[in-house]
UniProtKB/Swiss-Prot annotation:
There is a cross-link at K5 (Glycyl lysine isopeptide (Lys-Gly) (interchain with G-Cter in SUMO2)). Its main location: cytoplasm. The modification Phosphoserine is found at S137. The keyword Endoplasmic reticulum applies. The modification N6-acetyllysine is found at K249. This is Large ribosomal subunit protein eL6. It is found in: Cytoplasm, Cytosol; Cytoplasm; Rough endoplasmic reticulum. It comes from the Eukaryota. The gene is Rpl6. Residues 1-56 are annotated as: Disordered. Belongs to the eukaryotic ribosomal protein eL6 family. Residues 1-16 have a biased composition (Basic and acidic residues). It comes from Rattus norvegicus. GO terms for cellular component: A band; cytoplasm; cytoplasmic ribonucleoprotein granule; cytoplasmic side of rough endoplasmic reticulum membrane; cytosolic large ribosomal subunit; cytosolic ribosome; large ribosomal subunit; nucleus.
Length: 298
């Protein structure tokens, strides 16, 4: 008996070992780390190999086989339930209506007792002629308040090629932008006979050539009003002078001549300091056979 008692604890000790062995048998076998990575990479490849296909095959680029209503039924979009997003907007308080009339009590047995009276009385007299009311402009500003933008390629001192007008094809020096958005340019006059004048930036080609005019002082009175042409007076026919009348001709003022000399005297030394720049400004721009404007580099 003593021997059997000694053997029993051995069996108990073996049972948990058996359970562990049984547990190991049911559990999945451990695989090497490389095998796990390979299996995961294969799964990713399988997922990537299935591209998403549209249920509406394309007949021609931008045109599907089925219409929008047909695809609505094919996708069963009618089964979806849409709920509008809830907004936390406070309800606007209703303004109290201003009463236009007031009921007042009236004495007398035959007057009805009450009478409706307007708070705002109508005018006693009306205008004989209709005066037009000024309508509110919906964000439209007058031309004087428009924003003046200048092309990034046009900076003070840039040599420009004029494309329209009597000086088309000539190269000029840009001085500044005026209040109306027009460009103030000069030839100078001694080189290519282009005086101080205004031109629009749409009809100009900006070149990469520049003249240093940082120290050039431009008179402040050179504005749009300065260059605006004054209307010439037409002479009235008088008795005996029907055929002898002459039209008034435009003449350059002494102020214009003085301003032209003042500006050109400062720019000409800057131009002469750069070799071949005088000849470049004297020459005119023109296109010949085989020259394409969109391929030229100015």
């Amino acid at each position: 008996m003593a021997g059997e008692k000694a053997e029993k604890p051995d069996k108990k000790e073996q049972k948990p070992a058996a359970k562990k062995a049984g547990g190991d048998a049911t559990a999945p076998r451990a695989l090497p780390a490389g095998a796990v990575k390979k299996s995961s990479s294969k799964a990713k490849k399988l997922r990537k190999s299935k591209p998403h296909c549209s249920r509406n095959p394309v007949l021609v680029r931008g045109i599907g086989r089925y219409s929008r209503s047909a695809m609505y039924s094919r996708k069963a979009l009618y089964k979806r339930k849409y709920s509008a997003a809830k907004t936390k907007v406070e309800k606007k308080k209703k303004k109290e209506k201003v009463l236009a009339t007031v009921t007042k009590t009236v004495g007398g047995d035959k007057n009805g007792g009450t009478r409706v009276v307007k708070l705002r009385k109508m005018p006693r007299y009306y205008p004989t002629e209709d005066v037009p009311r000024k309508l509110l402009s919906h964000g439209k500003k007058p031309f004087s308040q428009h924003v003046r933008r200048l092309r990034s390629s046009i900076t003070p001192g840039t040599v420009l090629i004029i494309l329209t007008g009597r000086h088309r094809g000539k190269r000029v020096v840009f001085l500044k932008q005026l209040g109306s958005g027009l460009l103030l340019v000069t030839g100078p006059l001694a080189l290519n006979r282009v005086p101080l004048r205004r031109t629009h930036q749409k009809f100009v080609i900006a070149t990469s050539t520049k003249v240093d005019i940082s120290k050039v002082k431009i008179p402040k009175h050179l504005t749009d009003a300065y260059f605006k042409k004054k209307p010439l007076r037409k002479p009235r026919h008088q008795e005996g002078e029907i055929f002898d009348t002459e039209k008034e001709k435009y003449e350059i003022t002494e102020q214009r001549k003085a301003d032209q000399k003042a500006v050109d005297s400062q720019i000409l030394p800057k131009i002469k300091a750069v070799p071949q720049l005088q000849g470049y400004l004297r020459s005119q721009f023109s296109l010949t056979n085989g020259m394409y404007p969109h391929k030229l580099v100015f």
